[in-house]
């Protein structure tokens, strides 16, 4: 099922009544409610964030857990993960299917699917997109009756009263195409973006490294006569020059060429780094004056996902609302053996999303957050962190009174498996375990590092 796990988490919580935050419909709001009268009867999920607002909502830059409730519900990568199946299973989102690569040798000759890694020069991914997927209503697509864009080009005076994306009253949409993914992958190489994964993907995608170098040269030329630190930069149009490793074969077919055999590559395609970017959005936000007003993909994303950002008050409040152009995806009908008994398949086949609006309010202190959650002002303390749930599980285990209180409030504390990776590094400049300044020391130090790695008891470390 091409459904966002986080979206389905919201859906499951709401449909199961896992956390009862709102009072029965028809009752008046309590006098100390932080919400407007009648809000408790609306189809809204209330939650909180405890640190700053998300720093990056641009999918090429976003690499932090606290940004994922926004990015994975606004943008759509090619793939996602099945909400209920464990171990995790890739599923298509905007793609028709999870595509298997074809292989060629150095001469470009086709190889069988079971070819040896040493014989494979390239892995070629041809990915078909689902037709008819539309972007959210957004000013970047707005056009006048004669077909000209409503908000490009804009004169300086046109921005004097524009501070949030809602100040642009006209909106439009268009269909998602394979070129939007091509544009997104090209942006990863742009020096204007400084994506944290460019160097990693450039090692694997054919031609990406050289393309990044060429973009740096073009960007340097565009900045030549500008003062240092200028925020208003000429648009770096990525439609004009590309690289052979990524191309659109037609409107709905994307081809990616990967060096050698790299079976893990498909998992990158489930991350928002490869979420589509319409060139219209890149051009719209590059106009003079936009950066000074924080009008950019970092603050106002443009996507095809189930939700869109309707309100954004930095370090105060963010609101996601249902994307009216979202096609709707069926809730899964299969999962783990215990899921049916737990009621997690009760909504089988129903169209998602189930929730009309998601409201994030800042709560800097944990005790007030916990208190408001227990009073019903929040459905979930934090959607991106499980700390509160872990603390409540411990409290319920230690105190029968707490367990009774949670049961009285109808609070459920389901657990799931989360994949994590931890590692320890060696100081490369250390004379004993580092690189070593002679060939002999390099060999000795490497063997010592390997011995330490073998001797380290990971099982005991995890248990502690």
Residues covered by each model-derived region:
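N-terminal lobe/hinge region of extracytoplasmic solute-binding protein
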Residues: 48-120, 302
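Short, well-ordered beta-strand segments
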Residues: 45-50, 381
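C-terminal motif of bacterial Sec signal peptides marking the signal peptidase cleavage site
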Residues: 18-21
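Extracytoplasmic/periplasmic ligand-capture domains
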Residues: 23-37, 83-84, 100-103, 131-192, ...
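Bacterial N-terminal signal peptides that target proteins for export
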Residues: 1-11
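A structural "hinge/loop" feature
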Residues: 51-71, 82-83, 91, 139-142, ...
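Surface-exposed patches in mature extracellular/periplasmic domains of secreted proteins
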Residues: 90, 193-201, 463-464
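Intrinsic-disorder/low-complexity, polar/charged segments enriched in Ser/Thr/Lys/Arg/Asp/Glu/Gln
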Residues: 44, 122-126, 251-255, 357
